[in-house]
Amino acid sequence: MSIIKSVYARQILDSRGNPTIEVDVCTEQGFVGRAAVPSGASTGLHEAMELRDKDSAVYLGKGVQKAIKHVKEIIAPVLIGRSVFNQQAIDTLLIELDGTLNKARLGANAILGTSIAVAKAAAMSLNIPLYQYIGGLNAYILPTPMINIFNGGAHADNNVDIQEFMVMPIKANSFAEALRMGVEVFHQLGRILKEKGLSTNVGDEGGYASNLPSNEAAMEFILQAIEKAGYQPGEDISIALDAASTEFYQAEKEVYHFKKSTGIKLTSTELVDFWKNWVQKYPIISIEDGMAEDDWEGWHQLTQAIGSKVQLVGDDLFVTNTKRLAKGIEQNIANAVLIKMNQVGTLSETLDTVNLAKKHGYQNIISHRSGETEDSTIADLAVALNAGQIKTGSVSRTDRTAKYNQLLRIEETLGEHARFAGHPFKK
């Protein structure tokens, strides 16, 4: 039995230079579990609420001292003396302590930091990796990475509407090989942009963030980069997109406004046609948030139109929430769910969503947030849950490569038992 001796929280900085919370859970035996909580830029309306201080004189209102105080004064006293191995019971207690539907009282950041730190302390107590503690002996599948190589939307100050353009090395034989392929394409894209006199500055998630003639130009440059790296688009490497359509949806007018590029406005039906054309034209394997979070009719049309051809991922749509996912399953909307722990707020609730998705044949993609830290928990989680896919940004920022490097270590540790997921979407 490993008993919690103390729970401590501190304020650190995330990859955007904004404060976030880091929690330490220490046991009587001297083991320490430490977890840092990320933050999103394009957040879903239905996400659990992260608590910010809103004091404009300090960190422009983005401090997290209130959340830290809640950990120290409310959460810590009720966890001290409990076993770190009672994850479900501890997470349930945290939810009850908060007492709101969206964790607005204590803050999802305070709760999640504690939840993950408990799991890490438990793994440390047993002297086993986190992925093995969560997933057991069946945790051996390395995920296919969605490697972000171009940023737009809310993640970049450019004129591209679509938030993320990613490459998926589906023909790789190992995670290490997949990562190498993605790195080679990333650098080839940088060379292409430079040759054309375009900026090679990067966005929030490490992908290039140049101003381009159009959204289509990003696709064309990426195809060129794949070929220049020596690979066949659609055979060796496919393309995944995160449209983040909620960001350019005008709900009051029920139109999608491509305001950063051409300025065109599309109805839901017209946007479905837009995606149909792109799927026919380009080797796209996955589209995340192709419609806005509450455009259920648009999502239904999109799923009917191309759901048998590509992976349709709900991020803002489902927000890692079992109730939202259950509604999507009932209405046959999308076929995959993005898993972000801070959208729901505890490890146990995250696992509930993953299990519900698996039960109904939906794919799971374990994901980072745009405001990240050096914490690599999601790498372990992807392997623990045999999710098969991970989305953790580009290969040019340490907050992103920390996750990729952890997956390299895990693959090495698993040795001959490791399996690479490969092609993520098979109908």
From Swiss-Prot:
This protein's encoding gene: eno
Protein name: Enolase
Functional description taken from the UniProt entry: Catalyzes the reversible conversion of 2-phosphoglycerate (2-PG) into phosphoenolpyruvate (PEP). It is essential for the degradation of carbohydrates via glycolysis.
Catalytic residues, chain numbering: 205 (proton donor), 340 (proton acceptor)
Known pathway: Carbohydrate degradation; glycolysis; pyruvate from D-glyceraldehyde 3-phosphate: step 4/5
Originating species: Amoebophilus asiaticus (strain 5a2)
Positions bound to (2R)-2-phosphoglycerate: 163, 340, 369-370, 391
Record-stated family: Belongs to the enolase family.
Locations listed in the record: Cytoplasm; Secreted; Cell surface
GO cellular component labels: cell surface; extracellular region; phosphopyruvate hydratase complex
Binding site for Mg(2+): 242, 288, 315
Protein keywords: Cytoplasm, Glycolysis, Lyase, Magnesium, Metal-binding, Secreted
EC number(s) reported in the record: 4.2.1.11
Any GO BP annotation: glycolytic process
Primary site of residence: cytoplasm
Cofactors that this protein relies on: Mg(2+)
Short name of one Pfam family: Enolase_N
